[in-house]
Structures are given as C-alpha cells and as structure tokens.
C-alpha cells in the first residue's frame, strides 16, 4: 500500500496542483479543490471522501483526478455549486468555464466562497511556489483538517500536499496522519491561508460534512469535487470522471511521481499537457514529492512528486486557480495522505475515467488536482507505474478538463452515495448545466465506467494495481471514448460502482442546480438516473469503498483523454430519466367494483331530502301473551292514569292450620292479648325411667336431698396377690368420717373379706338393679 500510496502521492500532488487538493481538503481530499466556492461542495464531497479516507479514497481521488484537468475555477465552481447549492445557483449560475480558465478567472470559486477568494488572492501572489502553498493554505479553507494534519505531520515537507493531507487527515485518514509530519509545514501554511480562507472553512463548515465527517467528507468532498467538476467543465468533469475516492487520486499521484497531485491545484484542461512537458520542471516539487513519496511510503502518500508539475501547469494556466486550487491542492494533498489508505480508491476512481478524462481526474483522489492528467498519471502508475505519468500528462491536460467537466455531471452520482453527496449533487447539477453542451453524458458515463474501472483498478491496486488498473487501462485505450463511456456509465449501472458517484456529481453539477439536485436526490430513485446518478450514487458509496481497495490509477490513464463535456447531457438525460411518464388516472367507470360496492356509486348525499316513513303496526290481529293484550291501547299519560285497586277477598281463602284465626288481626298495641297456659307435664308426659321423680324439683338451696349409698366393696375386697400391703380407703360413711382407717379385715394375702362389709354388698345389688332398670 505504501508504494501505491506513493504513486497516489504523485497523483495527489497532481491533484493538489490542479485543485484536487482543495477538494481533498474539503472532503479530506476534495475540499481543497473549491476551497472558496467548493468548500461547501467540498464538504459534501469530503464526507464522501472521508469514508474513502478510511478505506476508500476513491471519492476524493476521483474528485482529485477530475479536478486535475479542470481549472481552479472549474473546481471551485463545482464545489461552490455543490457545497452551497443556493450560492452556486445565485452567485455561480454555473456558466461553463473554459477548461484552461482558472477559478479566479472564471470567478466561480471566488464568488461562492470567501475562502476561495482569499485562497485565490493568495495564490495569485505566489503563482508557483505559493500555488502549492496556497493549495495547502487553502486547505486551511478546511483549516481544521489541514491544520490538524499539519500539526500531526510536522515533518510534512510538502506544504501543498501537507495541507491536503492535513485537510484529509482531519477527516480521519490514517494516511493523512502519516503524512501529517510531512505536511506539517504545509499545514502551517494551510493554517495561515486557513485564516485567509476561514470563510472557505466556514463553507466547509456549512458543508459540515467535510471536516466533521471525515469519512463523509471524503465522499462528500468527492461529490463536491465531482459537482465542482460539473460546475466547471474541466475541474468538475475530472473529479466526476475520477469517480474514485481522493485516495485513488492520491494513489495516482503517488503512482506518478512526476505528477505532483498537490502541485496541480486547479490546473487548466491543457495543464496536463503542460504538466507532461513541465513534469521535468516540476521535478523540484518532484523531489519534494519524492520526499513526500518517501513520507508517503512512510505515510503511504506521495504528494510532492506530482505537485510541482501540476503546480507549474496550474500556474501557467490558472495561477489564480493554483491559488484557489492550491488550496484545493492542499486538500488534494490531504487526499494524498488519504491516498495511501484511499489510494486504491483513488485509483479506482481514476479508472472510471480510463480516457483522457481519467488521467485528468487521476488526481481526483486529490481534490485539488483538477487536471485529468493526474488521474491519467495515476492510472499509468497503477497500471504501468511510470507510463501513467505520460498518459496523465497527455490526457490530463485536455481530457482532464473535459473529464472534469464530464465528471461534474457524474458528480451527482457521488452525492447519491451519501446524504451530503445528494446535497452536493444538487449543487453539482447546478454546475453541470454549465457544461451541458460539454460531454455531460460522457461525464456520467466516465464516472460509471470509472466506478467499475476504479473498483477494478483498486482491486488490482490492492492486489497489484494491475488487475483493476487493467480495467481502467482498458478504459484508457479509449480514453476519450472511455471518458465518455465512463460518463455514460453514470447513466449505466457500471458507473455506480465508484466513479459513478463522482461522475454523477459532475453531471449533476453540470445540470442546473435545481435539476442536478433533483437528479442527485432522485438518481437512486428514478430508473433513468439510477443508471446515471442513482446507480452512480448507490454504486458510488460501495464503489468508493471498493475503489480504496482497488488501485485504479492505471485505469485513470484513460482519464487523460479529454472527456467531452457531455456530463451536462448526462444530467439532462438523468433528469429526463428521473421524470417518469405521467401515469393516467385510472378509469373508474370500467373498473369492476367489489360485490355491492357499485350500488351506491351514483349516490348523492343530500341533507334535506331525507324522508322517514313510519309504518304503524296493526296489532289488532296479534295474539298477545296472556294478559298483555289488555293494555295494548294504553297510552302513557300523566293525567289519565287510573289505578284500579281490587281488595283481596280473603273470606273464601282457606288458611293454613291456625293461620285463618288471625286474618283480621290488625297490628296494634292496644289489643294485644297474652294468653299463658301452664302445661302440666306430670299429667301428660311420661318421663324416662327414674327421671320423673325429679320433674317437679325446683332448684333451691334448702330442698337438697342427697341420697348416699355407701359402697363397702373396698372394705371387703381382697387383693389377688398378697403383696403384704395394707389397703387404706375413706369410708363413705354419712357421718363424715373421712379419716382413713386400717382395714383390719384384710387378710394377710391382701384379699378383702366381703362378709365384713355388708354395705358393699348392698351397694352392688342396688347398682345392678338400677342398671337392669335402665336396660343396661
């Protein structure tokens, strides 16, 4: 990944030079592209790229590559349109800007974003050296990210890339952090410019997605880049064409050391060609990029190598663009930092623009690189490792601008992947209308193709940057065709993979803001856009994520092919697609209703026509229940109530036994008679045996009669065993002699002598007699 990222670094430097860095900064990658106007768009795209940042830098990369070709204004305009749809619509109606036109020249980026204006001014001052610095300082447009990364990367020798990386790193890109040391100086510059471009950062803040959601920023940045590319045909088309995450662009930049992605901030469309020729001249930055590469190898991001060439071209074509795009370039560098982690994504994003577009969009990973050259280079590096540089130089120059233009239309797809993307898409579409005459369809196609190519390239890049690179490489053969094809893919399902989102963004940017927005929002829903925008968008998230894994830089070479700005067509077609044929209202007359449902079909409710018919029941013939017919004619009425009281004649009633005697009894206290009859029980009742004797007994203390029968059996009793003991008992003598007395009559054997106790014998007889009486 270190090598691929280094390659991407080259591309990312390129992206930075072209303004991809600005986008990247915005989206962690893409934000730098249109720091001023694209900051908002970049923010949106940045979110897209930030996710890429983690593992998919393709959105940023795509944007970077797309941006590589387009000028800073193109990049700025798209970002502005995307980031601030309202602003874009009002301030930047998205007039198509010449590919070579810089953001300041076009006035697109400056109008939308104060940050861009500041960046543009700064960039104008230092056209060559400051282009890079401003690229990075513009990253301060997303200063939070750029500064963070810069601080994190004190050793960042590559200021342009450093800011980009820093911008991206705030997005949360590991690679960015790695490159932080390398980009620390850049980050410092970025901070300085950040103060200048704080307005830009606020735009990004408005984009919100850009820095806060690093990952979202990557995607959003990508979307913004694509949208920016759409707004400014070259810049926007390139990002859209890249359709890959900023890392893809970063990888492309890395893969193409000669092509500092960062250097290329907003390079003109022909900047790629210049870069090709100027790459040697850019070598000063190249060494810087080389060091960046080393750091990228260390950080897995190489931004310096490609930065100078792009910067030179950017300076040549749009020094203001470099100022603005340099800021984007810083984001592009951020994308390059991401490039390592998202490098493959960037490559993949570049793959979508195999044609010259892709080379231009190759730095798309680097939001700043707006020259497709970067993409092409990245593609070459991914595929060939070196050939990519030349291709990128070629296709990046013209195709990149075209690609960026086309990409803007494709950008809408990027928005689709993320919520921020959709917002960006609307903005992007607003910009897209600007290059409607441009190959908007191509843009949409390129993003699609790029998306698939980017994915393949990324896979290859991940595997060897050869498999996926080859897909893009295949696309490169027909760089223009592929650029168009890539843009067409925006319409077609293939595009959705990764570049599609970028392409969609570009395409949508191309279309009028309202149209593009609807396209972005609708692409996923409408079948037509689903191919162009929806497929790209839905595919784009996945594609981007895939792109990070798949190095698509080789395929990006095709991006070099200047993609005709058909993206506007794509957005238009997307719109037409989105517009579903009006569905005629169902003919209810011919519809068979459910059972009984048509009976009231003609019913017209009317409150006054209600007739209540009361039918009186003829009860004369009705046989009522027993007695119920008597009252049938009874009419309740308070005045005619008659209560018939019939007293009950009890004279004829035979009462129960004894009850008739009291029938005339009237309760009253005066006529109470109490009759007491004493019953003589003795006369009528026969008592039980022996019980009658006491029937007349009245309880009383004086009349007690106690009959006592003395039992003497104890006295006469003898123990069965003679144990020699004496039996002592109380004699039941009436006299009351209760003192125990010695039984003298007890034999020695202990047996009682009954003869000596006549009382006991008598008692026994009485008891037996009494028991006999009772029947016992």
Curated annotation (Swiss-Prot):
Position(s), cross-link Glycyl lysine isopeptide (Lys-Gly) (interchain with G-Cter in ubiquitin): 44, 589, 594, 602, 616, 633, 646, 652, 656, 666, 678, 682, 688, 704, 710, 720
Residues found modified as Phosphotyrosine: 18, 29, 532, 729
GO cellular component, one term: cytoplasm
Processing after translation: Polyubiquitinated. Requires functional TRAF6 and may provoke SQSTM1-dependent degradation by the proteasome. Phosphorylation at various serine and threonine residues in S-P or T-P motifs by proline-directed protein kinases (PDPK1, CDK1, CDK5, GSK3, MAPK) (a few sites per protein in interphase, more in mitosis), and at serine residues in K-X-G-S motifs by MAP/microtubule affinity-regulating kinase (MARK1, MARK2, MARK3 or MARK4), causing detachment from microtubules, and their disassembly. Phosphorylation at Ser-597 by BRSK1 and BRSK2 in neurons affects ability to bind microtubules and plays a role in neuron polarization. Phosphorylated by PHK.
Residues with PTM N6,N6-dimethyllysine: 480, 646
Bias (Polar residues) ranges: 61-71, 440-452, 736-751
Lipid bilayer topology: Peripheral membrane protein
Modified residues (Phosphothreonine): 69, 71, 111, 470, 486, 492, 498, 540, 547, 552, 566, 738, 762
Localization per record: Cytoplasm, Cytosol; Cell membrane; Cytoplasm, Cytoskeleton; Cell projection, Axon
Biased composition regions of type Acidic residues, renumbered to the chain: 217-228
Pfam family, one: Tubulin-binding
Biased segments, Low complexity type: 324-340, 529-549
Modification type N-acetylalanine: residues: 2
Residues found modified as N6-methyllysine: 594
Residues modified as N6-acetyllysine: 480, 560, 594, 616, 625, 633, 646, 652, 656, 666, 678, 682, 704, 720
Claim: Cell membrane is one of the keywords in the record: yes
Ranges for the Tau/MAP repeats: 579-609, 610-640, 641-671, 672-703
Keyword annotations from UniProtKB, A to Z: Acetylation, Cell membrane, Cell projection, Cytoplasm, Cytoskeleton, Isopeptide bond, Membrane, Methylation, Microtubule, Phosphoprotein, Repeat, Ubl conjugation
Subunit organization: Interacts with MARK1, MARK2, MARK3 and MARK4. Interacts with SQSTM1 when polyubiquitinated. Interacts with PSMC2 through SQSTM1. Interacts with FKBP4. Binds to CSNK1D. Interacts with SGK1. Interacts with EPM2A; the interaction dephosphorylates MAPT at Ser-396. Interacts with PIN1. Interacts with LRRK2. Interacts with LRP1, leading to endocytosis; this interaction is reduced in the presence of LRPAP1/RAP.
Domain notes: The tau/MAP repeat binds to tubulin.
Protein name: Microtubule-associated protein tau
